[in-house]
From Swiss-Prot:
Domain of life: Eukaryota
Name of the gene: Snmp1
Residues that carry a glycan: 66, 186, 213, 226, 440
Organism: Drosophila mojavensis
UniProt-recorded name of the protein: Sensory neuron membrane protein 1
InterPro entries documented for this protein: CD36_fam
Amino acid sequence: MLMNRLKLLTASAGIFVFAIIFGWIIFPQILKFMISKQVTLKPGTDIRALWAATPFPLHFYVYVFNVTNPEEVAMGGKPRVQEIGPYVFDEWKDKYDLVDDVVEDTISYNMRNTFIFNEKASSPLTGEEIITMPHPLLQPAGINVQRERAAMMELVAKALAIVFPDANAFLSAKFMDFFFRGISVNCSSEEFAAKALCTVFYTGEVKQAKQVNGTHFLFSFLGQANHTDAGRFTVFRGVKNNKKLGQIVKFANEPEMDVWPGDECNQFIGTDSTIFAPGMKREQGLWAFTPDICRSLGAVYQRKSSYHGMPSLRYTLDLGDVSADEKLHCFCKDPEDLSTCPPKGTMDLSPCVGGPLMASMPHFYKGDPKLIQDVDGLHPNEKDHAVYIDFELMSGTPFQAAKRLQFNMDVEPVEGIEQMKHLRKLIMPLFWIEEGVHLNKTYTNLVKYTLFLGLKINSALRWTLITLSLVGMMSAGYLFYQKSDALDITLPPKIIKDTNKVANQPRPEKQEQQPTSPVAVPIPGVNLSNPKVEQRARY
């Protein structure tokens, strides 16, 4: 009986320890190891194929700010805008000219984005709506010359009048013309001023312009980015070190940028946003480099979330306050002079794109309140305008995400150009975009049945074993308690036999009790049939 209790206690304790060690230590490590071997950019793997050509489109939304009082604004009035959108596009991503470097464990490739207008999702918008915006060529040209080449203002003003006859500070055109088909630029004039101005188009300095023939160009915000090379990347494949998977080594064949007045701001941090390493820590954040703004941005953990019943973590980001963060001072025009820093929640893109453009969150969400006060019609809120990513750390899978960014013009009055001399100094919103993804069941099921099913089985197994082991240990403890608490009295066989004999004898007649005589009490181990012993026992 004692041996059985010890066996039960030992077995239960062993199961308990096994459940703890295997369930919380061994199994997760095995799972992480298996994932790390599968999630690499090694040729021939499923992950490599999905990464090289995304088999589903991302959603790409464009919201444009239509200026409803352009004449008033041109004379110094406060802008009033009306948001129109979303114009919905299917964005397909693919990579080409892939070259592996086995020694360095890197892969080089060119990124390409293709936008296809989704008429059904955009309805009732068609793309043919007339939009009024700050003139995308006249205003930037005038502001740039005033800031950097004021001595050339007279020449540039004459050139603008030739190339853009009858142009105003604001331009009304169809949405598709602004963003994809293009605004016509006529460089056919033989005037010296016009030829000097058109040089920037012929040399390719205006990246958004496409040459149609020998004298004409088409300018659009996104046309040149559609189905064209978005830059050459070199990233780690993650075969030798899975923690480095996707991290950018070079962009445009350079190990760092030469855009900002500070090494820290010129670094490539993170991935190209199409892949992340598995098994990251929550506090690491999700970092990605965005060529459009020449900057790496990091999303930070916000809260726990879920997607189709699967647990995930919600990450978010904003542009921060450049003047308040010493690490971001290199995004100021002069890092030593904080007055040259952009307002809170914005980023000066002029060193990156060469024009007076500013980036921000949509509707200046989390920006300086003055930005919102300067323009009527803005209504920032977290639901519609915050950046978010629902991310699963163990597999490195983004379940859903919305990357949102607004582009603005840094407007100021230009004395040398009649159409712009009365403008207010403010940051004028132009449009904002959202690039997002929501994984469908085909791909969420891959995660669910390869990762979460294993985790659920492990959880069920370890808790079952822990429960059984606790029941076993409690049962063993109860049995030990009963053994120690019980009074186990056993008489020798001879005494039991003699006692039975006495019990079977006829009862003697009642005699008068002698008060002074002690009562005869049977004493264990004493032979009561012996008169001498009985006599000693009485006295």
